[in-house]
């Protein structure tokens, strides 16, 4: 399987990247980035390469590079805290759909989008509405398969760290009791590894639901 990955430098994206590198059935990973960076996982060069572009609102200049890939994993996103709706929409809707249209034109069959628990196009919270609109647009875009991932709390594992110090402190504190918390709150807690493995599984084998909640993701 050949995978395109957006958001590889974020916490979730790092987890997805790691699972792709470790999976022997994944033969290639194309990371779409704004700036070239050093590989974060030991010697993945034979499998992982970067596509550098500074325009995430229009991929037409580089979309030929997407041809020949089977699935696109999209984990790029920002927190809505402190953002006005127009600004949040520009990042959450415009970039996501620009990427989706480009990979679809290139013949990519499967699109997997990391959304969030509580996403609802008719919800009261701004972020939930915007993400819900994004999900609906992706589901109606014409991919052979499209899956919306709605994890709750995602705990980083295997040395992966959040770029936000406060979040990382919370994750570090939770890690020793994670197995207990997952049994107590299966609908709300997953790990970066589970998200990555679930993405690979649904892209490879399909899944009966197009929208996967945390409990679905944690089952992989």
Question: How would you label these PLM feature ranges?
Answer:
Residues 32-39:
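Short, polar loop motifs at secondary-structure junctions
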Residues 1-25:
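N-terminal Rossmann NAD(P)H-binding glycine-rich loop of SDR-like oxidoreductase domains
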Residues 3, 31, 47-98, 102-105:
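NAD(P)H-binding glycine-rich loop region in Rossmannoid oxidoreductase-like domains
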Residues 7, 76, 112-115, 150-152:
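Active-site beta-alpha turn of Rossmann-fold NAD(P)-dependent dehydrogenases/reductases
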Residues 22-25, 121-220:
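Oxidoreductase cofactor-interface core, primarily capturing Rossmann-like NAD(P)-dependent enzymes
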Residues 35, 86-133, 140, 144-149:
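Conserved Rossmann-fold NAD(P)-dependent oxidoreductase catalytic core, especially the SDR/UDP-sugar
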